[in-house]
Amino acid sequence: MKKFLLASALAVSAISFAQIGFSSTRFGIIAGGNYSGVKNAHNPSGPRFAFQGGVLALIPIGSENQFFLQPEVTYYGAGETGKDKDAKGVDGYNAVYANNYLSVPIYFKGYFSEAASEFFGMAGPRFNFLMSQNVKNVPVIRPYYDPDFQDPLYPNVNGKASKFNFGLGIGIGYSYKRQLELAARYDFGISNTYPGLDKEPKGTTKSKSEQVLSVTLSYIFN
């Protein structure tokens, strides 16, 4: 948490001293696929495939056509399933633990040169606000994975997802004429997605953080 706050403070300080060209902001749309999982949460545990899509802004930093801020507002599917490749036929294999967010990442984006078509890298924080949680087919022996179920034996244990979480994202991509862009990203979850599972019987107190690998395609308007 301290590292995250320090990184955010440094980013804000850097931005405050940079020449940000809000008047030259361009807007665009973005869509892609997510491959997500949650560490230390469910058993069995496997990946979930989901969708993301929304809008973005490209805000110049400095006079060169090379460095930008790219905030986004997207629908962002994450969570996981029970489809562990080594758990076929096991109770809970068909479970779904879907978390759907309104997500707001803020990337620092740098193209490798000022050329019209060029590779780029990006990094920055991501803030997720839970819109809905869809859970089904939980293991019979772990009914508390269902956020609507309260086990009288373990009243403090539940599978409710946090209303808010955050992480750090990195990515690399290619831009065709600074309009059509393809990118691969990885979001490292930092906060605890399922604090109610920290006291799970025979579970772990390690943070249940979401990790998301995604591929996105965006179009930026002139």
What is the predicted function of each stretch?
Residues 23-25, 47-51, 98-104, 162-168, ...:
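Residues that define the transmembrane beta-barrel architecture of outer-membrane proteins
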Residues 25-28, 35-37, 44-92:
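Glycine- and aromatic-enriched membrane insertion/assembly motifs of diderm outer-membrane
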Residues 29-31, 69-73, 106, 121-123, ...:
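Membrane-embedded beta-strand positions of outer-membrane beta-barrel proteins
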Residues 30, 207-222:
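Outer-membrane beta-barrel "beta-signal"
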Residues 33-37, 75-79, 100, 110-112, ...:
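Transmembrane beta-strands of outer-membrane beta-barrel pores
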Residues 39-44, 89-95, 154-158, 199-205:
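Extracellular loop and loop/strand-boundary signature of outer-membrane beta-barrel proteins
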Residues 56-60, 107-111, 171-175, 218-220:
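Transmembrane beta-barrel domains of outer membrane proteins
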Residues 65-67, 116-119, 178-182:
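Repeated loop/turn-to-beta-strand initiation elements of outer-membrane beta-barrel proteins
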